[in-house]
Amino acid sequence: MRAVLTWRDKAEHCINDIAFKPDGTQLILAAGSRLLVYDTSDGTLLQPLKGHKDTVYCVAYAKDGKRFASGSADKSVIIWTSKLEGILKYTHNDAIQCVSYNPITHQLASCSSSDFGLWSPEQKSVSKHKSSSKIICCSWTNDGQYLALGMFNGIISIRNKNGEEKVKIERPGGSLSPIWSICWNPSSRWESFWMNRENEDAEDVIVNRYIQEIPSTLKSAVYSSQGSEAEEEEPEEEDDSPRDDNLEERNDILAVADWGQKVSFYQLSGKQIGKDRALNFDPCCISYFTKGEYILLGGSDKQVSLFTKDGVRLGTVGEQNSWVWTCQAKPDSNYVVVGCQDGTISFYQLIFSTVHGLYKDRYAYRDSMTDVIVQHLITEQKVRIKCKELVKKIAIYRNRLAIQLPEKILIYELYSEDLSDMHYRVKEKIIKKFECNLLVVCANHIILCQEKRLQCLSFSGVKEREWQMESLIRYIKVIGGPPGREGLLVGLKNGQILKIFVDNLFAIVLLKQATAVRCLDMSASRKKLAVVDENDTCLVYDIDTKELLFQEPNANSVAWNTQCEDMLCFSGGGYLNIKASTFPVHRQKLQGFVVGYNGSKIFCLHVFSISAVEVPQSAPMYQYLDRKLFKEAYQIACLGVTDTDWRELAMEALEGLDFETAKKAFIRVQDLRYLELISSIEERKKRGETNNDLFLADVFSYQGKFHEAAKLYKRSGHENLALEMYTDLCMFEYAKDFLGSGDPKETKMLITKQADWARNIKEPKAAVEMYISAGEHVKAIEICGDHGWVDMLIDIARKLDKAEREPLLLCATYLKKLDSPGYAAETYLKMGDLKSLVQLHVETQRWDEAFALGEKHPEFKDDIYMPYAQWLAENDRFEEAQKAFHKAGRQREAVQVLEQLTNNAVAESRFNDAAYYYWMLSMQCLDIAQDPAQKDTMLGKFYHFQRLAELYHGYHAIHRHTEDPFSVHRPETLFNISRFLLHSLPKDTPSGISKVKILFTLAKQSKALGAYRLARHAYDKLRGLYIPARFQKSIELGTLTIRAKPFHDSEELVPLCYRCSTNNPLLNNLGNVCINCRQPFIFSASSYDVLHLVEFYLEEGITDEEAISLIDLEVLRPKRDDRQLEIANNSSQILRLVETKDSIGDEDPFTAKLSFEQGGSEFVPVVVSRLVLRSMSRRDVLIKRWPPPLRWQYFRSLLPDASITMCPSCFQMFHSEDYELLVLQHGCCPYCRRCKDDPGP
């Protein structure tokens, strides 16, 4: 840093205070009793302002630039406009010591010896507050919320906008350390910078990629570049990056200068940050730069010093002849103004020089004057090293980093050999003050440049070697070498260029030119030397011959490519110039200085930052390609070119028959197609092919240069390849030129290819015609089939010979797919493929044609009826499916289908369907029972399934009643059903049937109908069962309420036995039979009332046909005096009507038979003779005409006037009116689902 005096002036009186206009164009000085207004650009006094009667002590400008204020010993404050006009004046009781504008609200604080006042343009009066001591200085926080007051008694008082004290800070010196100047830091992102600094020495630095500070205790300690993000700043941000306002409100830092000759820093809360810093003089003024990065401090030492924001002294801005009472930095610039006791006004420009070092991809530079940032140009990683002292010089080489501080040199090393490692640690310290122009570091040495002299020092500070030059040294660069024996390239002002080895006392003169050296670089192989002289000319020499190879103008820096011997770049005049070998220079716009060139990356320094610019090497590559230097062009391309450039290189090399280079280039762009071509050419070369025309023809054909390829094919004697190429390309007009002399195979091939082309370009009809003419019927059929051209398909099928089975079969397949079964059948018949014809009928469900074909060819019976049966089953036509299964002889499959349907219905609680399927199963078993071998087994299953069908049919109503919110059945019906189920359930309850639901329904309906005894019995039974939660409450309530009912059942509900006229109890232990005569009750399949029917049996020897014929005879009723006879034996008791010659009378023999009282506990069936049968009326008899092997069942109605209907299919009994209603509702029998119009069995 150095300060340049811009202008200076001298006033008659002491300069007490200074204020800049916010835009920096004007400067307001408090001198004597006047205000002096200066133009900052040239120091011209614009206007003196008069208004005060005594010395003006202070002046302040509002942030909006509209007003400024001045305070004087005359106890008054004057408000001035930016047009230098006074607009307001108010007074205090004492002299005004300081004034300050709120940066946000523009409220003015004015402080005197005894009080301070707050004024704003919106207020008419000034609010004043008393002070315990004389106020010397004041300052607002960045957000304008708090005002800090510095007092003569050493106290700092922090007040809010209303003047109320919030924080009080007492300095150790008390009244012996008056607070002479205070200032809030405009930047607030550095608070954590101070947190761990109290016990740190200057040389113990903190290295952290993310600017997190960790104390260092040992010289050999390792500092990691990994860490958490710090609060004050990001590693990549510079000081001029945007601030976070919210963070600023929390972390305002107050700098305090007192006459205890100390500088200290405080947080807004009053907590001190770090230790006090001794000054050794009385400070009179302290102020920050606009962005808070530096502090200006002046006082009794008669100079202004520049400090870092943490209080580290950096240097002197300007020395004066008297005390410095005020100093300020011009807003947003590096200009500083100083006001002195003797009236001197000095205006300085601060110039911050760039201190940096570069080695390959590592760049180190100074930041904030006391920090060093090392940047990895490839990975963009950064690490900050905090030195806490002014950084004077930086040098970097391989894993070494040297930093020169005012009193020492620190040498760092990388922790590991990893190329991307950013872990630095202190290796050595040279505690000695050095003055040098340039600093260079090697593996084990430090090189100092002092004008004409070079000194080589070890890391311990011992001078090992010294070189004295003839002229001033202008440039030094380490060019590498073994550790301890590195070579240096030195350029002198007299044009001499030398090479010096660290371990050699003698310098080697490489060459000497007429002009002074500005920049140097040596090529990777050390055979060429590039020099930039003071005339901005880049000169390139051959080191061995000292010959000037070429020179280029407009250069200020130069760098050789570290990966390519013949490439260099230089910058100048706002352009970047890239030169390859002796080719012309390629130029592009670029600001800055070239400092390195590695592959395709050019490192450019612009102002204070360095950046890696990715520069495609396309231009030099094409220069090599123009001269057919493919291998050299490939080397250039490896440095970095676009994919398009790689492809161009590959194509050029391929046409130049440089297959090796072309192969490498195509690998780069991953073009497998061309790689296969090159591979095939290499294989052919290995087999001895040497015809380059043929190779080049293949290349041209791949590149799309077909006519050139055809000419080369023809020239090389391979016309067939040209024909094949044009055919594949569908360029048939050109292909005909290469046809042989009427070769039918080639002609057919050409037509086929043309048809393929027509097919691909969506001309299918033309393609079909071409395929037919070429004899490719299969392909023609495929096109017709894909486009649904049925007419063309059948036309082709009819023209084909029946021996051509493959195209005919394909035709039939497409016709079937296109829903033209008639044409498909015609094709199958032409082929004689009857099995496929049967399959066609089955798949298209043309059952009539299939059955007709099956009649003619019985061998296809299974192929027809099995699919038919499955189709019927899928369409819920189970009766027909069963017949089909039977017809196919697949009884087991029929039973399996029904069993599966039944199980599914039970599992899904579809009990009505389950009953229907069980009935069908029973009828299936009855049909199978006709086989004598399976008769007994099947009859057992028949009765079992019949019983299950009856149970599930009844339980369906119970289930719906308990699950649905509304019931469609009358209470009497639900009562009868639940009684029927309770008496009928076997010991093992069938799957899906719930005893709880049956008993719950029985209890509920019994209670409703007056059968209280039966209801109590049902509730008692329920207590022994597991009750679902949803029934629990109802059952508990019913159990309690039934106790209040009488313990008997209503007589109206008691069932009557129509054989013996006995009243049976509602709860019958014997089941659904009479307790007296054991006659089974016959129930209605809808209401489950006991029907007035009695089953009777035929005497032995009477066949079913004879019985029917006897019943159909209409005879007179027998007379009342006919006798009834009883024949008894030891084994059984049989009631028989004896036929005598006088037996015909008025009394009905059957009725008389039923009224006979029998004894014993065994059931005695009613057996009738021919006479009794003859006496019966056909209207009173119901017959269940079971198919064999079962016998028919006969039932006699005892109340002929009450009509009963029996379903002719399932033989279930109904009240006639119930049956008719149900058939009207459902259109079929509710039990077996036989439709009304279906014929009987």
Curated annotation (Swiss-Prot):
SMART domains: WD40
Acidic residues composition-biased segments: 229-242
Effect in UniProt of substituting S322F: In CED1; no effect on interaction with ITF43:WDR35
Location of the protein in the cell: Cell projection, Cilium; Cytoplasm, Cytoskeleton, Cilium basal body
Keywords, alphabetical: Cell projection, Ciliopathy, Cilium, Cilium biogenesis/degradation, Cytoplasm, Cytoskeleton, Developmental protein, Disease variant, Ectodermal dysplasia, Repeat, WD repeat
Location (main, coarse): other
GO cellular component: ciliary basal body; ciliary tip; cilium; cytosol; intraciliary transport particle A; membrane; non-motile cilium; nuclear membrane
Tissue note: Expressed in many tissues. Predominant expression in testis and pituitary.
WD repeat intervals: 10-50, 51-91, 93-129, 131-169, 278-317, 319-359, 512-551
Effect of L712P: In CED1; uncertain significance
Keyword Hydrolase: no
Top-rank lineage group of the source organism: Eukaryota
Disease note: Cranioectodermal dysplasia 1: A disorder characterized by craniofacial, skeletal and ectodermal abnormalities. Clinical features include dolichocephaly (with or without sagittal suture synostosis), scaphocephaly, short stature, limb shortening, short ribs, narrow chest, brachydactyly, renal failure and hepatic fibrosis, small and abnormally shaped teeth, sparse hair, skin laxity and abnormal nails.
Function according to Swiss-Prot or TrEMBL: As a component of the IFT complex A (IFT-A), a complex required for retrograde ciliary transport and entry into cilia of G protein-coupled receptors (GPCRs), it is required in ciliogenesis and ciliary protein trafficking. Involved in cilia formation during neuronal patterning. Acts as a negative regulator of Shh signaling. Required to recruit TULP3 to primary cilia.
Xref: PANTHER family: INTRAFLAGELLAR TRANSPORT PROTEIN 122 HOMOLOG, WD REPEAT DOMAIN-RELATED
Quaternary assembly: Component of the IFT complex A (IFT-A) complex. IFT-A complex is divided into a core subcomplex composed of IFT122:IFT140:WDR19 which is associated with TULP3 and a peripheral subcomplex composed of IFT43:WDR35:TTC21B. Interacts with IFT43:WDR35; the interaction connects the 2 IFT-A subcomplexes. Interacts with IFTAP; the interaction associates IFTAP with IFT-A complex.
Protein name as it appears in the record: Intraflagellar transport protein 122 homolog
Organism: Homo sapiens (Human)
Upper classification of the organism: Eukaryota, Metazoa, Chordata, Craniata, Vertebrata
Gene for this chain: IFT122
